Amino acid sequence: MIQRVYEGAKKSKMLSDVIVATDDERIVAAVKSFGGKVIMTKDSHPSGTDRCGEIAANFEDVDVVINIQGDEPLVDFRQLDALIKAFNDQDVQIATLGIRDIDMEAILNPNRIKVVVNNENQALYFSRSPIPNFAHSKENPLTQYPYLRHIGLYAYRADTLKKIIQLAPTALEQIESLEQLRWLYYGFAIKVVETNIETPNIDVPEDVAKVLDFIVDFF
């Protein structure tokens, strides 16, 4: 799976380098076996963002860092390019992806993260619960509101990455188990770039079969 993620990322012509960051020797061996670039990190990082921060500190000329998680075997280079292009706006400090193609099963599934945005497409909140809540809706929620599912790819300006990895954890992120809520809590704006490219990820073992079916249908 790591190889698929790596090779998918390498297809982006806008990335200057792709590095696997890990604290596991087995992953190091796997990446080296297919000729990938890998760097060992400390094993104490609470999140992938912190791990990215350790690696980015070794590269002084980096301006934007993209955190591509290892559970995204179908990552598409067009998604990565869209994230990078968001930084053409000098006000953007953090960017991530969202997709409107969502059904009720995903809205109710706590492993599918939902996000709501303001009129500037900046995130207001991320949640494992349905947001907005439709308990009092008298219509079909899917026709009443354009629900947005979060795709867990993050990009940060290098100087912003240095700042957010210094932030103390918050109760909000801990109860939802969503690290990006820490950044919102401390006042960092997160630009949500909409995409129509569907790339199922693997959050739980049951997702493996869904990803394999997707590969059979679309590749």
Enumerate the language-model features and the residues they cover.
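Short, high-confidence coil segments that cap the C-terminus of an alpha-helix
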Residues: 15, 61-62, 90-93, 188
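Short phosphate-binding loop-to-helix
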Residues: 19, 25-68, 72-85
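Conserved alpha/beta core of the MobA/IspD/sugar-nucleotide pyrophosphorylase nucleotidyltransferase superfamily
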Residues: 142-219
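A conserved hydrophobic position in a structured secondary element of the catalytic/binding core
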Residues: 22-23, 75, 156, 203
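N-terminal glycine-rich phosphate-binding loop and ensuing alpha1 helix
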Residues: 1-21
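Conserved core of the sugar-phosphate nucleotidyltransferase
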Residues: 75-167
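Short, structured coil segments at secondary-structure junctions
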Residues: 14, 34-35, 119
